């Protein structure tokens, strides 16, 4: 996938300016796509355990947008409590598949969102994984799971081919509880 694919997976969500987090941001592929869509007046909290990946993200953000203002880097495990403001939206791109108990992690991230806040999920569209993608979930599985964690029924946004595990999908669900 390239930057255009990342943007195109998020674009159908029609996000507006606000306060967002990219949980499991890594080196920032989807953080950069999110920034392109929500603009420089939005605040983005990029959360990842890997400090060096966050440093790469910061450099890439500065190179692309000539600023790191309103980009807040947090070196932390998002499955633990975080000090974040109420969020308008969360991006979880290829981070949910690291958790076996997905309902538990979804309930956890649910608490970071404002009422009606958006959860954008990007995942491999398969239910069986490998050592690098241990617990993926198809859109159909996610569609069933998300409402049990306090979200609306997810809406499929887009799909792009994957060289490794068939395809990626993006979906949006909203905090309802």
Residue ranges and their predicted role:
Residues 1-19, 33:
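Conserved alpha-helix/loop element of class I SAM-dependent methyltransferases that forms part
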Residues 21, 27-80:
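Class I SAM-dependent methyltransferase SAM/SAH-binding core
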Residues 79-90:
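A short acidic, Gly/Pro-enriched loop at the edge of an enzyme's catalytic core
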Residues 88-102:
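A short SAM/SAH-binding and catalytic strip from SAM-dependent methyltransferases
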Residues 103-115:
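A short glycine-rich, Lys/Arg-flanked "PGG" loop and its adjoining helix->strand segment in the class I
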Residues 116-124:
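Conserved beta-strand signature within the Rossmann-like core of class I S-adenosyl-L-methionine
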Residues 135-150:
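Short alpha-helix
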Residues 160-177:
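Core SAM-dependent methyltransferase catalytic element
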């Amino acid at each position: 996938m390239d930057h255009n694919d990342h943007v195109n997976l998020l674009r159908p969500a029609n996000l507006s300016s606000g306060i967002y987090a990219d949980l499991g941001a890594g080196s920032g592929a989807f953080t950069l796509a999110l920034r392109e869509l929500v603009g420089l007046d939005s605040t983005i909290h990029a959360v990842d355990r890997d400090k060096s990946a966050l440093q790469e993200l910061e450099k890439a953000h500065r190179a692309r947008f000539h600023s790191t203002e309103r980009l807040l880097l947090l070196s932390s495990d998002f499955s633990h409590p975080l000090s974040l403001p109420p969020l308008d939206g969360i991006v979880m791109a290829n981070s949910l598949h690291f958790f076996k108990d997905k309902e538990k992690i979804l309930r956890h991230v649910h608490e970071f969102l404002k009422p009606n806040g958006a959860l954008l999920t990007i995942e491999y569209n398969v239910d069986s994984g490998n050592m690098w993608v241990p617990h993926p979930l198809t859109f159909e599985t996610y569609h069933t799971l998300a409402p049990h964690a306090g979200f609306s029924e997810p809406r499929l946004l887009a799909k792009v081919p994957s060289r490794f595990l068939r395809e990626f999908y993006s979906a949006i669900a909203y905090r309802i509880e």
